[in-house]
């Protein structure tokens, strides 16, 4: 899952920003022909590369290229005179660092150039719109401006794409020119090595060698001056590295204060980016420090070239944190160096580790902002990765929990069914108990009656012993218990009946209260209806009054119209009179006018009166209308209130009806329950009568069983006698076997002493080797050429001695395996006695070298108890051993299966073989002298205690012998059977664990079975590198977790120190083959596991469960 992210990003950014520097790349080729101009050409080409990657602003490009050129020239000026040629590792580091350091700068400049282009495009649109606004309408102007903006955007994108393609082509040409320079420098390096008289060829990785002309030989004076300059430069670089280390510590403290930690595990991409960002100056300094340590230019190149950046990265990918970077990089450096520069490896390793730990000069000049941003991105990436892992682990745990809940629900259903069945059986037993109690009371009365008769007739009687027997007491106790249970259940039933009666009474009370409430609501409804009726009557009276007033108003209107008609007539008459007055006699006319005026006054007075009456009638009419509208509004409001109250009363009534119906149904159900209980009582009485007959039959059968019991007791006594005889034979056999174990312990102690001597010799040789290497380092600065040959000769001699020592140990192991005793106990004892008394032969003296004392438990050491049978015995032999060792059954089963001496000889032979060949040599080499001496003293004390116990009288029991043998050595633990002291409860628990092996693990660790198995795996893989088990999917995708778990049991099958997380197929193949070798069937597909990043967690958990079941249950 850990894939390289930063290299890919740098590659993409490198492809985006491509300059037009084909001329500079072409100029780099002729510049590399001369030896003095080669570093300068590299500096120029790297500056061109930086300028090309910047690509955006020409002014900034020139400024950056000038600063880069001055920095590179200033840092490498001291090396131009003394070191005319540079190794391929330095060039590759220079190129990788320059590419990685300029990645972020290129991205920023591309973004700024695009932002400026977008601003120009956005500014061009409104200007064009303003120029065309005077000629066209607003709609046409907007359409044209949008079209121009889209066209300018598309043109800008096309131009950016073309520029990027040209930059990509230029960078490809520049990379090819760099490859040519690297090949040229490598050929010059070979020529220099040939001139200095050093053999061997420089290892190359995928590069084609080109033939170059030889350069003239360098004189000894030039070499000495070069060495002196290199030593001075090495000293200066070391001082600068110390300063940078202190600055690095300060930056780490600042990062820790900000909340970021460098000790978190980074992805491979982050590691690659951080390593690739080392400056070319420090890479050159690393090569110079190597040269200062060895004394020649060629040796410095030879010491730094194999430990290139790629080798260091591949070696560090297995590391745990950034703190152990120095040790891991030095180990990788020593591993990849050739045999010719073996003496230069320590100095090269130290300088390369220092160059890796220290940040570059460029990065220190840029400040801590770039480091903080890179570390923050790395930390965020790691946190996101951890969050994804936690999410998947949580989902996996939830699925496992749901499965376990489903299983528990199924078990609960089964237990409920079992509980119901037991309840039914209990009811039947209660009925039978009641019948038996009644019968017992009847029999008791009969017995009392018969005793009274015997007392009256003075007849002596004696109770039979059977009545006083244990069965009688048992039956009496059972009767008391059943009577107590019957009383308790009877009280429960009475309580239930009382509860039902109380519930019925409460329901009746609630019903009565509901009826009373219903009556009150009905009465209130009638009252509201009466009020509504009275209101209706009042409204009818008001309407009648209103009709009367309307009639009066209509009569007044008719009178007013009549008066108006008369007024019109009088006016006509007045007009006639005026006409007569003008034509006739004035006196008559005056009289008539006077009469008419009087009539007019009377008519006007009458009209005024009628007008006042009309106005008064109108006022009364309006008042009546207002009163009527007010009464109408009040009536409507009252009607609405009455309807609302009626609706509420109807709803309350409906609710009370529903409650009443529910109460009635409850009462009916209670009555039905009472009827059913009465029926059940009748049925139980009938069953009681039937069970009485069954009890009589059972009593008859009990008598027959008692007779059979007496017969079985006699047979048991006979079997006990046989058992005593066979136990005596078994004790004798155990004594013989203990004697063999004691002799084996003595031989084992002698072998451990010899192993201690060999280890002391080996340690002395190693100390001597270290002293001589230190002396070699001191003398090497004065006489380098002469001392190199001597040291090589000495190292070869030491290696030959060590190879001869290992070969002798291997021959001793083979001779020990070939000189095995015959597979019988008597011949074993005779051979052990002869070996302890007589002088030891060559095979016998070498045999104990392969047996190891109880070793301290380390992550890569085998399991102390289960390794010898599993690692050195085939599956068929293992099952035969376990089958024959389980012959020590409980004493009750020895009457059928009696072990003989030939049956036990095979386990003894395999036990001795396991003690002699179970431990691999690697495990022996990891044990210190102190541990071996302690183990020897413990084995001696245990053998002496065994001899004293064997001298004790023969009355000791077999259990004590088994305890002493278990204390003497682990072999006796394997030979003694653990089933002799197993109780029935533990035996049932063992059967349960075999059926479900994770149940015991869940009880031990707590929580679910999945989490318990996960904790067990974590505990087993403690101390193993690159193992972090948090789930059953992604934590197992590289096969290392399987190998680590199986390595704790089968260390001989899995070379864990040689495994890597990249070789997934090999890891899975080794793990599955090791598991199949002991009988664990493989249920996983290797192809699917290799190609799947997150395998099916249920399949993985099933396979891990099979491993746990095989080795732990």
From Swiss-Prot:
Keyword Transmembrane helix listed: no
Its localization reads: Cytoplasm, Cytoskeleton; Cytoplasm, Cytoskeleton, Spindle; Cell junction, Gap junction
Basic and acidic residues compositional bias, start-end = 145-154, 941-951
Domain Calponin-homology (CH), by residue range, is 1007-1112
Which ranges form a coiled coil? 220-259, 379-433, 473-791
Please tell me one Gene Ontology term that the record gives under cellular component.
gap junction
What family is this protein classified in? Belongs to the cytospin-A family.
Write the protein's name.
Answer: Cytospin-A
Q: Which organism is it from?
A: Tetraodon nigroviridis
């Amino acid at each position: 899952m850990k894939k390289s992210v930063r290299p890919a990003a740098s590659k993409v950014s490198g492809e985006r920003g491509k300059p037009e520097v084909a001329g500079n790349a072409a100029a780099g080729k002729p510049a590399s022909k001369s030896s003095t101009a080669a570093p300068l050409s590299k500096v120029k080409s790297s500056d061109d590369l930086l300028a090309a990657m910047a690509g955006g602003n020409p002014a900034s490009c020139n400024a950056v290229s000038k600063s880069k050129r001055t920095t590179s020239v200033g840092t490498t000026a001291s090396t131009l005179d003394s070191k005319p040629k540079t190794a391929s590792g330095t060039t590759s580091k220079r190129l990788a660092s320059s590419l990685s350091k300029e990645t972020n700068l290129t991205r920023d400049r591309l973004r700024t150039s695009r932002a400026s282009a977008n601003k120009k495009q956005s500014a061009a649109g409104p200007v064009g719109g303003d120029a065309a606004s005077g000629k066209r309408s607003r709609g046409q102007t907007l359409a044209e401006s949008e079209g121009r903006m889209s066209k300018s955007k598309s043109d800008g994108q096309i131009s950016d794409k073309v520029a990027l393609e040209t930059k990509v082509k230029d960078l490809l040409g520049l990379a090819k020119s760099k490859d040519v320079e690297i090949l040229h420098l490598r050929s010059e390096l070979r020529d220099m090595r040939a001139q200095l008289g050093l053999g061997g060829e420089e290892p190359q990785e995928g590069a084609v060698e080109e033939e170059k002309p030889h350069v003239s030989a360098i004189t000894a004076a030039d070499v000495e001056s070069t060495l002196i300059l290199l030593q001075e430069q090495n000293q200066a670089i070391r001082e600068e590295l110390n300063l940078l280390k202190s600055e690095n510590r300060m930056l780490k403290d600042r990062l820790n204060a900000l909340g970021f930690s460098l000790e978190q595990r980074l992805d491979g991409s982050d590691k690659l980016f951080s390593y690739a960002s080392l400056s070319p100056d420090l890479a050159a300094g690393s090569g110079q420090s190597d040269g200062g340590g060895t004394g020649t230019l060629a040796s410095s190149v030879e010491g730094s070239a194999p430990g290139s950046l790629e080798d260091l990265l591949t070696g560090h990918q297995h590391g745990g944190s950034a703190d152990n970077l120095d040790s891991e990089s030095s180990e990788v450096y020593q591993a990849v160096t050739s045999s010719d520069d073996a003496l230069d490896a320590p100095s090269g390793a130290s300088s390369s580790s220092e160059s890796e730990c220290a940040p570059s000069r460029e990065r220190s000049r840029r400040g801590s902002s770039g480091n903080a941003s890179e570390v923050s991105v790395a930390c965020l990436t790691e946190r996101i990765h951890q969050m994804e892992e936690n999410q998947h682990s949580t989902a996996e745990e939830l699925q496992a929990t749901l499965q376990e809940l489903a299983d528990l629900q199924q078990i609960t259903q089964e237990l409920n069914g079992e509980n119901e069945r037991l309840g039914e059986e209990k009811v039947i037993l209660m009925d039978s108990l009641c019948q038996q109690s009644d019968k017992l009371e009847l029999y008791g009365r009969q017995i009392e009656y018969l005793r009274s008769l015997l007392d009256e007739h003075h007849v002596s009687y004696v109770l039979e012993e059977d009545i006083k027997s244990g069965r009688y007491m048992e039956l009496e106790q059972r009767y008391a218990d059943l009577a107590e249970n019957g009383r308790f259940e009877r009280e429960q039933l009475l309580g239930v009946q009382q509860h039902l009666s109380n519930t019925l009474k409460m329901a009746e009370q609630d019903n009565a209260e509901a009826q009373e409430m219903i009556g009150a609501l009905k009465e209130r409804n009638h009252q509201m209806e009466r009020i509504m009726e009275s209101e209706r009557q009042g409204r009818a009276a008001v309407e009648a009054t209103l009709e009367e007033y309307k009639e009066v108003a209509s009569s007044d209107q008719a009178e007013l119209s009549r008066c108006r008609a008369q007024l019109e007539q009088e006016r006509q008459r007045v007009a006639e009179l005026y006409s007569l007055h003008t034509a006739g006699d004035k006196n008559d006319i005056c009289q008539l006018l006077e009469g008419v005026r009087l009539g007019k006054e009377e008519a006007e007075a009458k009209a005024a009166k009628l007008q006042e009456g009309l106005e008064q009638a109108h006022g009364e009419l309006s008042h009546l209308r207002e009163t009527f509208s007010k009464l109408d509004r009040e009536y409507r409001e009252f009607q609405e209130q009455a309807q609302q109250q009626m609706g509420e009363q109807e709803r309350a009534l409906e609710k009370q009806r529903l409650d009443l119906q529910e109460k009635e149904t409850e009462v009916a159900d209670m009555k039905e329950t009472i009827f059913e209980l009465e029926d059940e009582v009748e049925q139980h009485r009938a069953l009681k009568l039937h069970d009485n007959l069954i009890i009589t039959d059972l009593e008859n059968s009990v008598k027959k069983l008692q007779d059979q019991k007496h017969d079985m007791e006699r047979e048991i006594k006979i079997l006990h006698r046989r058992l005593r005889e066979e136990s005596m034979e078994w004790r004798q056999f155990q004594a013989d076997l203990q004697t063999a174990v004691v002799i084996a312990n003595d031989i084992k102690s002698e072998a451990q002493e010899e192993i201690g001597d060999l280890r002391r010799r080996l340690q002395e040789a190693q100390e001597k080797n270290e002293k001589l290497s230190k002396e070699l380092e001191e003398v090497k600065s004065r006489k380098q050429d002469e001392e190199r040959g001597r040291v090589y000769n000495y190292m070869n001699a030491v290696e030959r001695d060590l190879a001869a020592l290992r070969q002798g140990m291997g021959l001793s192991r083979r001779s020990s395996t070939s000189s095995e005793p015959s597979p019988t106990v008597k011949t074993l004892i005779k051979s052990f006695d002869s070996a302890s008394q007589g002088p030891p032969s060559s095979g016998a003296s070498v045999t104990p070298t392969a047996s190891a004392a109880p070793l301290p438990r380390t992550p890569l050491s085998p399991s102390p108890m289960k390794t010898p049978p599993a690692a050195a015995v085939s599956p068929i032999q293992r099952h035969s051993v376990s089958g024959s060792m389980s012959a020590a059954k409980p004493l009750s089963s020895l009457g059928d299966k009696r072990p003989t001496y030939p049956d036990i000889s095979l386990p003894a032979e395999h036990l001795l073989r396991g003690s002699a060949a179970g431990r691999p040599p690697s495990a022996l080499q990891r044990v210190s002298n102190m541990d071996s001496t302690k183990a020897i003293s413990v084995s001696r004390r245990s053998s002496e205690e065994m001899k004293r116990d064997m001298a004790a009288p023969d009355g000791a029991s077999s259990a004590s012998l088994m305890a002493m043998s278990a204390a003497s050595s682990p072999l006796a633990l394997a030979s003694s059977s653990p089933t002799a002291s197993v109780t029935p409860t533990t035996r049932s628990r063992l059967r349960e664990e075999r059926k479900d092996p994770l149940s015991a693990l869940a009880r031990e660790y707590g929580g679910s079975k999945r989490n318990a198995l996960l904790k067990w795996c974590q505990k087993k893989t403690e101390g193993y590198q690159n193992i972090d088990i948090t789930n059953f999917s992604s934590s197992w995708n590289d096969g290392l977790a399987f190998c680590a778990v199986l390595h704790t049991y089968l260390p001989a099958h899995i070379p864990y120190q040689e495994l890597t997380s990249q070789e997934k197929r090999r890891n899975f193949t080794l793990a599955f083959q090791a598991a199949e070798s002991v009988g664990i069937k493989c249920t996983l597909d290797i192809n699917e596991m290799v190609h799947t990043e997150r395998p099916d967690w249920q399949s993985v958990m099933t396979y891990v469960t099979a491993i746990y079941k095989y080795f732990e249950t």
